[in-house]
């Protein structure tokens, strides 16, 4: 059973408590949190400490108002009590609090990893819906050490061993971890001296979880503090090495890859074979992630055979991986094309002249034709304004698909052409991109920007700050 822990009143306030509060408030004060931010609070001692520090900061700096978020994934009966406890504590400190509940399909897995995924999904959804760009979490130095050991057990490379960072990116949300420089013991001492109350989660003591196993392993060592310090020092070394590798990945980008205005990537095989294997591997990984619209890497077991064949110049039949189709071209290079079956079939158009991000590959604009008069353009815009008619509601962007190709696309690789966007109304295609239109005031579709190259560069940055 979980329960609220209320420490006895302390006889004195040690120097370490004052130091933690001063350093943490200085860290919080240095963060760029314009426009408001959210604070993830589970009710444990770490997050309650963060909540207390944020409330103290808000009293002196009321420019950015925080919102406390606490999640209930429904795995434990005590979760309702814990979320209400957090809400009551937040309100007592003068802060707004939202309880986030997982109301989607139930999962058979109730592991800590599944709970974490659900929690982050809830947090990201709320932040996105409320246009909140910054999220604070209470990860600490001890969490970092345990994470490194867990990744080491899984055989992680430099990415995994570089651990968590004080600033990272999750989708379009920036996550800050202001307590990452303090151990769990330092935070516990602070909370005790400050007479804070918190919730004890029994799963944190359950040895069936690997994190608990490694937590106990560190605690049973001769000098736990030294072990934590050295493991965290390892993450710093690995992060520097990762930054170095990603620097060379970025500098090799245009040498090894060619980005087509038709929204696919050509891997220049000879150039790829001339760079170190680690650089080549990451370039191919990033290409698959960007083209497939993914933020995570493909399975190693499926990815490695493709990389090996490319580096060795071997032939292979076209194959799909990570939402992409990879094929060898007659010139010996390889193309990475979006897999048609993985593209969302319909994206509705609400207004004329809006720019839409489509399939994370194209920025698309819907316009009236350039040869329409001003009066016609006004009429067209009004026709497709907000609160649209039934006709406008049926206007959407969709991939061209496996039907017949228009004349201006017959010279294009069929896989590429089929994955291109078209403007449709009902079951009829109204317009294709890269085509001259002369059809009065009918809306047209144009590609404002191809986003694939930018997507690869963003992924490089996110790997450094994840």
Curated annotation (Swiss-Prot):
Pfam families: ATP_bind_3
GO cellular component: cytoplasm
Cellular compartments annotated: Cytoplasm
Domain of life: Bacteria
Keywords, ordered alphabetically: ATP-binding, Cytoplasm, Ligase, Nucleotide-binding, tRNA processing
SUPFAM superfamilies listed in its UniProt record: Adenine nucleotide alpha hydrolases-like
Protein EC: 6.3.4.19
Role this protein plays: Ligates lysine onto the cytidine present at position 34 of the AUA codon-specific tRNA(Ile) that contains the anticodon CAU, in an ATP-dependent manner. Cytidine is converted to lysidine, thus changing the amino acid specificity of the tRNA from methionine to isoleucine.
HAMAP family: tRNA_Ile_lys_synt
Annotated protein name in UniProt: tRNA(Ile)-lysidine synthase
Annotated gene: tilS
């Amino acid at each position: 059973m979980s329960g609220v822990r209320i420490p006895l009143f302390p006889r004195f306030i040690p120097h370490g408590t004052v130091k933690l509060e001063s350093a943490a408030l200085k860290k919080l004060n240095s963060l760029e949190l314009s426009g408001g931010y959210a604070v993830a609070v589970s009710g444990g001692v770490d997050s309650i400490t963060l909540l207390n520090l944020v409330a103290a900061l808000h009293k002196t700096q009321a420019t950015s108002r925080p919102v406390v978020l606490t999640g209930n994934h429904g795995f434990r009966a005590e979760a309702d009590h814990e979320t209400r406890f957090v809400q009551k504590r937040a309100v007592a400190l003068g802060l707004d609090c939202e309880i986030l509940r997982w109301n989607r399909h139930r999962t058979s897995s109730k592991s800590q990893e599944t709970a974490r995924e659900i929690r982050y999904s809830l947090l990201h959804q709320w932040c996105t819906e409320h246009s909140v760009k910054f999220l604070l979490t209470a990860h600490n130095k001890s969490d970092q050490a345990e994470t490194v050991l867990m990744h080491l057990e899984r055989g992680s490379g430099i990415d995994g061993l570089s651990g968590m960072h004080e600033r990272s990116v999750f989708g379009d949300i920036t996550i800050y971890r202001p307590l990452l420089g303090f151990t769990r013991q330092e935070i516990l001492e602070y909370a005790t001296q400050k007479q804070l109350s918190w919730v004890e989660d029994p799963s944190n003591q359950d040895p069936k979880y690997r994190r608990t196993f490694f937590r106990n392993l560190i605690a049973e060592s001769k000098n736990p503090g030294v072990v934590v310090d050295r493991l965290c020092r390892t993450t710093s070394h690995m992060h520097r090495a990762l930054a170095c590798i990603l620097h060379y990945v970025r500098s090799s980008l245009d040498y090894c890859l060619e980005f087509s205005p038709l929204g696919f990537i050509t891997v220049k095989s000879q150039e790829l074979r001339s760079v170190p294997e680690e650089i080549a591997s990451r370039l191919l990984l990033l290409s698959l992630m960007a083209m497939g619209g993914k933020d995570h890497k493909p399975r190693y077991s499926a990815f490695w055979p493709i990389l090996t064949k490319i580096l060795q110049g071997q032939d292979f039949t076209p194959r799909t991986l990570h939402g992409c189709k990879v094929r060898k071209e007659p010139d010996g290079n390889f193309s990475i094309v979006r897999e048609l079956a993985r593209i969302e079939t319909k994206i509705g158009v609400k207004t004329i002249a809006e720019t839409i991000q489509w399939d994370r590959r194209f920025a698309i604009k819907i316009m009236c034709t350039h040869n329409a008069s001003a009066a016609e353009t006004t009429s067209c815009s009004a026709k497709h304004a907000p609160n649209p008619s039934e006709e406008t509601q049926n206007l959407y962007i969709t991939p061209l698909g496996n039907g017949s190709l228009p004349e201006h696309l017959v010279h294009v690789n069929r896989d590429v052409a089929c994955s291109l966007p078209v403007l449709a109304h009902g079951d009829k295609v109204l317009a294709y991109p890269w085509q001259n239109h002369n059809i009065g005031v009918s809306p047209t579709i144009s590609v404002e920007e191809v986003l694939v190259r930018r997507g690869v560069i963003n992924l490089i940055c996110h790997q450094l700050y994840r």
